[in-house]
Amino acid sequence: MRLNVAVFFGALFGALGVLLFLVAFGSDYWLLATEVGRCSGEQNIENITFHHEGFFWRCWFSGVVEENNSNIWKFWYTNQPPSKNCTHAYLSPYPFMRGEHNSTSYDSAIIYRGFWAVLLLLGVVAALTASFLIICAAPFSSHFLYKAGGGSYIASGVLFSLVVILYVIWVQAVADMESYRALRMRDCWEFTPSILYGWSFFLAPAGVFFSLLAGLLFLVVGRHIQIHH
């Protein structure tokens, strides 16, 4: 009875972890950036460019917002314009764009971004592999498959933990926002970029928690089956 309860909760937590990982992987809201520029000299109107990016795409669109209004709601699906500009994020990580920075900065950004992308892909593969192993283990009560599935869940949790840490380092240290701001201020007498972590980013740590918990439960289940059968 206790074994069945552990398997049930392990499967539940594992499914939640995989779902959160897949949504974080497929959505383009790891980063929300707002560029506020006063280029026309008007005091009460701000020309704003909104950026959001994920693994696959980086998109941006323009808007005009009155002062004292919150800009974060502009990223909500229903508040976005019907058309916007998008480019492959792994080819142009924000704020680095080809032609706007020297080749050394751009190449370094691409290498860092590529390493982050590889870890993200490995995390997704590990989570899907873990789910497959657990599905195969259930009919046969195989302690080996339960342990392998649990280890894969733990591996996916560790990989996504590294993904989150690397992304924080990217935003806080690697992305040279000061140089980007200085470049844009050549055209606008006042330019202020603002960066926030998006909801896709926050889904990843939640997935890490459920994935690690599922992995530990399945390791315990596998150990229990090995001892008593």
From Swiss-Prot:
Residues 27-114, 175-200 are extracellular. Highly expressed in white adipose tissues (WAT), with 10-fold to 20-fold higher levels than in brown adipose tissue (BAT). Also expressed in skeletal muscle, heart and lung. Lower relative levels of expression in kidney, spleen, testis, brain and liver. Disruption phenotype: Mice exhibit significant increases in body weight, muscle mass, muscle fiber number, muscle fiber diameter and myotube formation and an acceleration of skeletal muscle regeneration. Residues 49-59 are annotated as: Interaction with ITGB1. The keyword Nucleotide-binding does not apply. Glycans are attached at N47, N68, N85, N102. Keywords: Cell membrane, Glycoprotein, Membrane, Myogenesis, Signal, Transmembrane, Transmembrane helix. Residues 1-26 form the signal peptide. GO terms for biological process: muscle organ development; myotube cell development involved in skeletal muscle regeneration; myotube differentiation involved in skeletal muscle regeneration; negative regulation of myoblast differentiation; negative regulation of myoblast fusion. Residues 136-153, 222-229 are cytoplasmic. The keyword Transmembrane applies. InterPro entries: PMP22/EMP/MP20/Claudin, TMEM182. Induction: Up-regulated during myoblast differentiation. Negatively regulates myogenesis and skeletal muscle regeneration via its association with ITGB1. Modulates ITGB1 activation by decreasing ITGB1-LAMB1 interaction and inhibiting ITGB1-mediated intracellular signaling during myogenesis. PANTHER family: TRANSMEMBRANE PROTEIN 182, TRANSMEMBRANE PROTEIN 182-RELATED. This is Transmembrane protein 182. It comes from Mus musculus. The gene is Tmem182.
